[in-house]
From Swiss-Prot:
NCBIfam families: L28 (TIGR00009). The keyword Ribosomal protein applies. PANTHER family: 39S RIBOSOMAL PROTEIN L28, MITOCHONDRIAL, LARGE RIBOSOMAL SUBUNIT PROTEIN BL28M. It comes from the Bacteria. Belongs to the bacterial ribosomal protein bL28 family. One of its GO terms (molecular function) is structural constituent of ribosome. One of its GO terms (biological process) is translation. GO terms for cellular component: ribonucleoprotein complex; ribosome. Keywords: Ribonucleoprotein, Ribosomal protein. The lineage of its organism: Bacteria, Bacillati, Cyanobacteriota, Cyanophyceae, Synechococcales. This is Large ribosomal subunit protein bL28. InterPro entries: Ribosomal_bL28, Ribosomal_bL28/bL31-like_sf, Ribosomal_bL28_bact-type, Ribosomal_bL28_sf.
Length: 78
C-alpha cells in the first residue's frame, strides 16, 4: 500500500539532507500517516482509512461526511 492519505491525497515530498559541510543528498519527507477507524453515521458503520494527521484534525472539526463531500469522495466505495 502506498504512503498516501486517502482523503487529502498527500504524499511524500522530495527534499535534501544537508550536511555540516553543506553537501546535499536527496531524501524523502514522508507524510505522518495513521490508520484510523472512524464511525460513519450515515452509513451506520465504521470506515477504516489511512489518514494524515492534518486530515484527522480537520475530520474532528468538520465531521466525516462533510469533509468527504467537500473533497468529492464517495464513502460507500471504502
Amino acid at each position: 500500500m502506498s504512503r498516501v492519505c486517502q482523503l487529502t491525497g498527500k504524499k511524500a515530498n522530495n527534499a535534501y539532507a544537508i550536511s555540516h559541510s553543506h553537501r546535499r543528498t536527496k531524501r524523502l519527507q514522508n507524510v505522518n500517516l495513521q490508520e484510523k477507524r472512524i464511525w460513519w453515521p450515515e452509513g451506520n458503520r465504521f470506515v477504516k482509512l489511512r489518514l494524515s494527521t492534518k486530515a484527522i484534525k480537520t475530520l474532528q472539526k468538520k465531521g466525516l461526511s462533510a469533509y468527504a463531500r467537500e473533497l468529492g469522495i464517495d464513502l460507500k466505495r471504502l
